[in-house]
């Protein structure tokens, strides 16, 4: 995988340009460490949401990227719109793991348990609905 090309995330315009460029070039797989770093960066919702939408196209997700997307799904301090986008992204990534010949070290059953726990905890119906809609992908991932 390539080194992190995104530089200073406070200069979000430049980071967004690089995101759009690697999306167009279809090289997202090669930039997963940088994408995970953007997901850890809490000070720009546009970057986070863009990455969450773009990672759905990653064919061989790294454990670090899966973990960061799961962290957003689970984080009670993040607004629900981003968490719902993260649920969809996680479902796509888990589905892509099924077709990945390389075995990820991340425990997929642990992800399933965390997702199930969200369904029985108090959250808005729209969040539960997004989880249920995507749960088949988690269960089969």
Region locations from a protein language model:
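N-terminal alpha-helical scaffold/docking segments in eukaryotic complex subunits
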Residues: 1-34, 47
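Residue-level detector of extended alpha-helical repeat arrays and alpha-solenoid scaffolds
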Residues: 11-15, 48, 83, 124-128
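Conserved hydrophobic register position within alpha-solenoid helical repeats
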Residues: 18-21, 51, 86, 130-131, ...
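Short inter-helical turns and helix N-cap capping residues of alpha-solenoid HEAT/ARM repeat scaffolds
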Residues: 8-11, 43-44, 77-79, 123-124
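Amphipathic protein-protein interaction modules
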Residues: 74-102
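Eukaryotic acidic, Ser/Thr-rich intrinsically disordered low-complexity regions
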Residues: 112-141
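Structural signature of alpha-helical solenoid repeat scaffolds
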Residues: 20-23, 55-56, 91-95, 135-136
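Amphipathic alpha-helical scaffolding segments comprising HEAT/armadillo-like alpha-solenoid repeats
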Residues: 2-3, 26-39, 60-74, 96-117, ...
């Amino acid at each position: 995988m390539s080194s992190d090309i995104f530089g200073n995330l406070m200069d979000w315009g430049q980071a967004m340009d690089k995101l759009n460029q690697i999306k167009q070039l279809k090289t997202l797989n090669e930039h997963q460490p940088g994408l995970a770093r953007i997901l850890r960066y809490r000070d720009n919702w546009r970057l986070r949401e863009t990455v969450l939408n773009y990672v759905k196209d990653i064919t061989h997700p790294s454990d670090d990227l899966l973990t960061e997307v799961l962290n957003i799904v689970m984080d009670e301090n993040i607004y629900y719109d981003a968490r719902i986008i993260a649920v969809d992204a996680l479902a796509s990534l888990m589905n892509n793991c099924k077709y990945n010949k390389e075995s990820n070290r991340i425990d997929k059953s642990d992800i399933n348990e965390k997702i199930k726990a969200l369904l029985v905890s108090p959250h808005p119906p729209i969040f539960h609905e997004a989880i249920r809609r995507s749960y088949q992908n988690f269960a089969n991932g």
